Amino acid sequence: MWRMLTCDTVTGELRRPIDIPSASWSLSVSDASLSTTRDKGAGEGEASSITVPWTSVWGRTARERARELTAGKRGIVLGWEEAGEFRPLVFGAIGQRTDTALDTSFSLDSVQALLSSRYVVREGQFVKGAQPLSLSGLSLRAIAANVGWYATEGKPGGSLPIDWGDFYEKGSHERTYWPYNVGNLSCADVLDKIANVIGGPDLTFRPYMADAHHVRLRFLGGSDADVYVGQERECVLQWFHGAGSVHSMSVAHLGPVERVYATGSGSEEEKDVHLAEDLTYCRQADPWPLVEESMSYTDSDDHSLLASHAEGRLHSDWWPMCQVTFEADLGDPQVPRPGELWPGDAVTLRVEGFPTLPDGDYRLRLMEMSGDLGTTVKYKFDPMIDPAEA
């Protein structure tokens, strides 16, 4: 069954259970969200905030109730409890809160949202002529871990319950962050850019119980050799007419992008540019029409970084793709429990009898999972090369 508790944002210390009558949640590789639904049991129509009746909030006095849900200081943990074990799934800090006589409504800021208000500037180094933060000879996930540390533990009052991992893992990468460029140094933005370069690793935060009274988050990243986050075991799910461990499966299809125009730093005719293209699909006997994209990367004057971002975009969009989505019921013992399967994990999907997906086993990587406080969970997977076009 699902359980929700309040906690302290800085330490992750659990406080008390809180009863939110109706809520929906979602997890992706890099982010998480939780919100109340307008109609209990409806899979559609999420509100932008969580609404809690005062009868569900601990406290006998106005001060106690207000402090239990202090914006910024307090958070919410959603997890799954089964056989006496609680597995946290979603962690977030209480954001802007609005109270009425009957209830209180607030947003829930995920870790990425919190890090969007932190900047990768060394403490005491935001002065004229300050030297940059230079990180070199490291793996991309080690650079990301250092970026996170400087934006949290490296600042007064900056602590968050995050285990950043290995700061010193060797690699061939380097990054330089100048204080004067602070407008482009939001920690969340920097982490996104590390993940989005060609060969960039998956970066994710996964909550866990550090002890019976504290929740923490592990910062996990793929290695330079394998960009995907590791997993303990790979589950097998099945779809076929009338049975199987998953249902309501759909497959979306998308054609290829053959060209990406990328612009970098500079102005007008001096602006740095890079063209990434592969016109193979346009030159087939049965050709695809040309599809182009444009992008901008102005955070650095390093042309190789601009090229890396452009080639990474082309590599992800060039193939004719399809994307699988399905639902599963947690009441089915064949379905992995919350906390056993995470976005970023690989899953083997065994298909038989789907109209446009040939029979066989497909190794898919989970991109997003979502649900409400019931037992139905929706899974969306990374796009894969369309087997009908391969």
Q: Where in this protein do the model-derived segments appear?
A:
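Surface-exposed cap/loop segments at beta↔alpha junctions
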Residues: 63-166
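Short beta-strand-centered interaction patches in the first periplasmic/extracellular domains
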Residues: 95-115, 164-256
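Short, ordered beta-strand-loop transition motifs
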Residues: 10-11, 21, 28-47, 95-104, ...
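Short, surface-exposed beta-strand/loop "edge" segments at domain boundaries and coil↔beta transitions
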Residues: 11-15, 56-61, 84-89, 113-119, ...
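Short beta-strand and beta-hairpin "edge-sheet" elements
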Residues: 20-22, 75-109, 348-383
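An acidic/polar, Gly/Ser/Thr-rich interaction patch typically located in mid-to-C-terminal regions
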Residues: 38-66, 239-390
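Polar/acidic, low-complexity leader/linker segments enriched in S/T/G and N/D
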Residues: 1-27
